[in-house]
């Protein structure tokens, strides 16, 4: 089985220990269903997805970075520890949050860049992706009469 180790973005580092698959990812677990579905599809294709703290980096066939890390040295160190792994950058956040994520000079260390900016895609190194917005509904819906209202 091929192994892909995922490094969550700096804002979601609490999702290590594979929590990105069971507690969701981003604000209020917004992408939990999407990441769980991704993991299931990958497993069916013979690919194991785990956060990068679950196995030695040396064992990875690919290292998947969710957004650029704060330090370029983090990418270089990962490359040194897993020299045969493919390095993938998934640009997850918008240019408002991380404009530097979109600068090509910041992509030099990566073999593949996944972006939702279709203008950049060449279907070789730069590839397009669409992450479905899959919010989860609460397990129990409180009756309307039991809800409290708040106003600012």
Indicate residue ranges for each PLM-predicted region:
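Catalytic core of nucleotide-activated saccharide and alditol-phosphate transferases
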Residues: 72-152
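N-terminal pre-catalytic "stem/leader" segment of glycosyltransferase-like enzymes
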Residues: 1-84
């Amino acid at each position: 089985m091929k192994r892909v180790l995922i490094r969550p973005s700096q804002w979601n580092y609490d999702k290590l220990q594979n929590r990105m698959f069971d507690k969701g990812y981003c604000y209020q677990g917004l992408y939990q269903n999407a990441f769980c579905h991704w993991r299931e599809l990958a497993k069916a294709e013979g690919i194991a997805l785990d956060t990068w703290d679950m196995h030695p980096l040396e064992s990875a066939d690919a290292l998947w970075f969710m957004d650029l890390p704060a330090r370029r040295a983090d990418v270089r160190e990962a490359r040194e520890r897993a020299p045969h792994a493919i390095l993938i950058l998934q640009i997850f956040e918008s240019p408002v949050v991380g404009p530097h994520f979109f600068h090509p000079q910041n992509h030099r260390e990566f073999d593949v860049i996944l972006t939702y900016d279709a203008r950049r895609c060449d279907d070789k190194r730069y590839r397009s992706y669409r992450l479905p917005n899959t919010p989860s509904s609460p397990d129990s819906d409180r009756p309307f009469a039991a809800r409290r209202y708040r106003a600012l």
